Amino acid sequence: MQTGRTEKIGNVVLDYSHYPEQDFYCDGASEDALLELVKTIPPREYPQEIYKAASWEVLYHLSDLRENIVGWLPVDKSMKVLEIGSGCGAITGSLAQKAGSVTCVDLSKKRSLINAYRHQDCDNVTIHVGNFSDIEPDLPTDYDFVCLIGVFEYGQSYIGGKTPFHDFYRIIKKHVKSDGHIVIAIENKLGLKYWAGCREDHVGTFFSGLEDYPQGGAARTFSRSGLEKILKECGETEYHFYYPYPDYKFMTTLYSDRYLPKVGELSNNLRNFDRDRMLLFDEKKVFDMLIREGLFGQYSNSFLVMTGPMTDIVYSRFSNDRAEHLSIRTDILEKGGKHLVRKYPSNPAAAPHIEALAENESIFTERFKDSTLSVNRLELKRTADGLPFAEIEYLENNRTLEELLDECLQNNDEAGFDKLFDRYCKIAAWKAEGTKQDYDLTFPNICVQSDIWTMIDYEWTTDKLTPQQIISRALNCYGQEDPVRMEHPIVKKHLEALGIGKEQMRELSEKELAFQHFVLQEKDGRSRTALGQLRHLIGNRAVPYQEFFARADRKKVQVFEDFGAGYTPEHSYYQYDAYEADDLINARIICKAGTKAIRLDPAELPCLVQIHGIEWRGKALTRAQLDQCLSTNGQVLADTPSHVPTVLFETGDPNISVRLDCLDNEATDGEALIIRAQIAWLSAEMLQDIQARLAAAARRKGFWFQR
């Protein structure tokens, strides 16, 4: 319902007092489709719509995983939140659920309508539509949190002027309480993903941010030092850096300077939902190196900067790419110099899943009480609104069993690996008969402090697997996560001892897929699709750098020069720029004085070549001239005076020879011979099929091609 300069969609108020009656920022048809979708589909069905659409736009705007970037913030119902650049409402719902009131500002009416329709049940959301600089003077100055999620980089669009980012920040600062917070989530200009071959998020081209945006554009991201420089020059003295991983858009884990990632943790790096990317190196291995060198904070893909007083939360992990009733969040807090762990349900439906942790802890504590394995202590508590959360002992100065096993492999310490693995096997089998098994008793889920081993994860239990199956799963998971591990002789020895060959690995993979299906299955039968699978459905490529070299090698042509003694390797060279498209050759050959003939080898494998034309001395050769000077070592197919010749080369050394001395006198220095052709490379199977077809045609119709 619209009244004057306001409109109400459900409980959400849209304020058009400063709306210029025109949307200056709109994605057109994709936003029209989004608006129709949110008008008719309830939010609980968005996962299925995301799956059906298999598009970046629908995933980006409607995925509940976008909320993770603010889901950990210590916001409560006593607080007011300002969200600048609220867009289609990716995080508005999470803020509204946590805060007393949420004020949104966005330039686009259409995006604001999408936001309002999807959150129409929220009675604490007001959306101001229009330019921020027009709306800002009327906003209160006592917000507890001001959130700019993927917005600060557009400062020059919001403000303009010579120092737009400084001015933008100073204006925002006016609207925060003295003990309040500004929260900025932004890509790191030096993020590792950009070095590794991802396109810059805003410009969409390779290395644009690393090259400092030579083509310009509306957005500017910053390095850590660049952000700190702006904050300091604006007089900000209290700020804290957090590191969303893999990035802030679909964050699963939040690290901080007080809790940095450990070696081996950053392995989820294929996240190019929006565009094709290159794979220039193994990001996990480079992240591991950066962690060891103390440089992770400089190369994190994204930053979250929070100004104001430091919070207790130093780490947060979201396990919510799951069915609703299984979705949880794990926080690590630092209080009085000590750490503690808390696990929260992501929603009320997941409360029983948290409560089950206490039951599992009791079962495993009893089972392992006389073994060499301890069970991490847990206490079930309640939040102010009555939801359960688990408070769990934090183990200081620990290493995981996985880390210790990796160390043995790196040092080729077979005896050390065997000792650790044998102890693990004895633990897995301890008093196993007739009791629950910890399905996820894998190597990363056992912490080692000196000689004390502790089970730290007992979220998933089963009474359907034997200890042998638990052990096989753990070792197979360990190997599958890293090809180097899987190929190591020590790991191969233990896989063989357990009877795990290729067939058994396939069966284990099928069981793993079945478990993932269980985790994604809602209680009402609906199922969500994991982010990794959505990346495949959207269909953007991740192309290894090796393929570029393979394509480059395939697309090189070799030129031979004949000065009267025939073609020899000594008088040959490669042209790497002869291709003007994937299958089009435009070879410009500069001839030396005395050149009598030129041979062009278009490839180093069987192929089909259609010669589009040959130029000599600036003129295209006629058909009569081609008949006089052109020869190949292939079969010319369907050759007619009105048709350019197509040649089948059955050899791995195809060549096209042009005798210049048949056209005129031999070449003088610097004259150009140009050969244009289209090429199709043939695999061995394709060549065999063509040869069989030609032979059959020859038997039926006679000899219809000429050499």
Show which residues each predicted segment covers.
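ATP-binding glycine-rich loop module of kinase domains
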Residues: 325-363
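Conserved structural core of kinase catalytic domains
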Residues: 375-421
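Short alpha-helix
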Residues: 217-235, 239-241
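A short glycine-rich, Lys/Arg-flanked "PGG" loop and its adjoining helix->strand segment in the class I
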Residues: 163-181
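Catalytic activation segment of kinase domains across protein kinase-like and atypical kinase folds
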Residues: 212-213, 435-487
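Conserved SAM-binding loop of SAM-dependent methyltransferases across substrates and taxa
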Residues: 88-99
